[in-house]
């Protein structure tokens, strides 16, 4: 990450788009939040491509012992068809399985790429950060929920139009503060 930040601060005259910067094999694609904190902080960092979207396994019929042509199936890859040479399990490296069922890393990617971030701002309120670059948040609605030991004590809808790439501070409502005081 320090290398891309160094590039962004080097006086370069063109943006950097990373290719295959975050290899998704297994659960190996950590550091996404760190990458995107740098990308959002540095104007010359224009994002990147995660390698890769989907596993390349093919459906293969097998029996309970794993022998081909049985009563069940698996996603086969890399030599499981008798092919030589092959890439082994190196083709099972996607954010999604071959049937597009998401792997756990997809949840992290969705969180890091969320269009709006809401962050507590001390004990008085919160900040809403619009991470979209071309539209405000007037098309979105949020819900502020106060939970105490898993029980909903207060809930209210939040609608606020935050301009593209901007932040808005909001104070907690008097109703929320009253609910919080009653819960203590």
For the regions a language model picked out, list residue spans one by one.
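Beta-strand-rich binding/interaction modules
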Residues: 125-173, 181-184
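Extended substrate-binding grooves/exosites of carbohydrate-active enzymes
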Residues: 1-123, 127, 132-138, 145-151
């Amino acid at each position: 990450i320090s290398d891309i930040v160094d590039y962004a601060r080097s006086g370069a005259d063109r943006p950097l788009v990373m290719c295959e910067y975050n290899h998704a094999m297994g659960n190996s694609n950590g550091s996404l939040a760190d990458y995107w904190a740098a990308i959002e902080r540095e104007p010359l960092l224009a994002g990147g491509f995660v390698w890769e979207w989907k596993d390349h396994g093919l459906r293969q019929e097998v029996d309970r012992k794993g022998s081909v042509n049985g009563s069940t199936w698996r996603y086969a890859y890399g030599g499981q068809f008798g092919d030589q040479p092959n890439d082994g399990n190196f083709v099972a490296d996607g954010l999604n399985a071959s049937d597009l069922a998401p792997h756990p890393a997809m949840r992290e990617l969705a969180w890091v790429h969320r269009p709006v971030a809401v962050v507590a701002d001390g004990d008085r309120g919160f900040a809403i950060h619009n991470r979209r670059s071309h539209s405000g948040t007037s098309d979105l609605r949020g819900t502020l929920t106060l939970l105490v030991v898993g029980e909903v004590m207060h809930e209210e809808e939040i609608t606020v139009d935050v301009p593209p790439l901007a932040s808005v501070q909001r104070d907690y409502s008097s109703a929320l503060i009253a609910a919080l005081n009653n819960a203590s």
